[in-house]
Amino acid sequence: MAFLEYQADHPWRFRFSTILSSPAEDFYLMEDVFSEEEFLLYSPAITSILKTRNAMLWFSLVLSNPRCCQTYGPVVPFNGFEPDDIFFFATEVNHLIEDEDDLIAEIDSNPLPFMLLISGSTLPVLYSKDHHVLHVMAEFDVDSLDTRKFKSSFKTAFSHGVYRLTLKRWGGPPHFSEAYYDENENTLLLSAMTDRGFTELTGAIRDCGLDIPPDADIRVSPAMVSTASEILGRKIDLLRYSGLFKEDVPVEKQEGLDRLNRLIELALPAINAGVQPDIRSIAEKAGYDPETAADILRQVTDQINKMGKSSKRK
């Protein structure tokens, strides 16, 4: 009876958590990234997984007993997803989610979509030099916007009732710091592809006289956007205004981008598995000579290794 009473008071839960420390073999001090609860977990599965890969985040069904917690069923490690990615996914599953308590309740009542995130578990963090590449966005209601005040710091363009404000020096790769003012909806959408780019963008807008908070509403990786779209069966379009200003990409440049994407797509399964890709075969399929392909993939591997070392330090 005591065991049943304990289980009733401590229900099994699916948790997203990170490793704080390992006090003994197969034992891990974990932190639930949404409730911030710390718990001691016994999991030989985690020990086995850590022999072949590093993970930033873990997802598992956790049951507790009076001495420690244990995992039941699959333990899913995520190479590149962060708590912000999971929160974004949850709001796409249920648009009524507003905070961590809502998210935890959604996982408890509807765990299946979160279990399907295993399809993106091996996707790596993307970096451009030292910058983490991800969507960083915020949206505000504004009564009006005098775009003339922005011309010293921004390049401006107009199309179909929407002004695009591209921050000078920060509007190109990897930051892509831009804002879109919709004069019909009286909304201002801020978008950048790095945290630094978003910080510079909000600072420049405040310098132009518009008092906005520095915090982002959305911070999500391209990998999660892609994975969520596949799981939910619909396209998730974060940059709804960018198509109004789409510039024609030269055929040669587009072909080069397509070949690069194909090369990385073919090589990633081997890279994520920790084995050497078949450079000659992959290069031939993607339209590269082996030497060039090897150089590109060496850079990709270096970035993934850098991510792994960073996650270990954390």
Segments the model singles out, each with a brief description of its role:
Residues 108-171, 175, 225, 229-258:
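Short Lys/Arg-enriched alpha/beta "domain-start" segment
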Residues 25-30:
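Short aromatic-glycine-enriched beta-strand elements
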Residues 1-5, 101-106, 188-190:
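OB/S1-fold single-stranded nucleic-acid-binding modules
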Residues 210-314:
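Extended, charge-rich intrinsically disordered regulatory tails
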Residues 1-15:
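Short boundary/loop segments of OB/S1/cold-shock single-stranded nucleic-acid-binding domains
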Residues 43-60:
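Short nucleic-acid-contacting surface segments enriched for D/E, G, S/T with interspersed K/R
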Residues 91-116, 179, 194:
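OB-fold/S1-family RNA-binding modules
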Residues 62-95:
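OB-fold/S1-family single-stranded nucleic acid-binding modules
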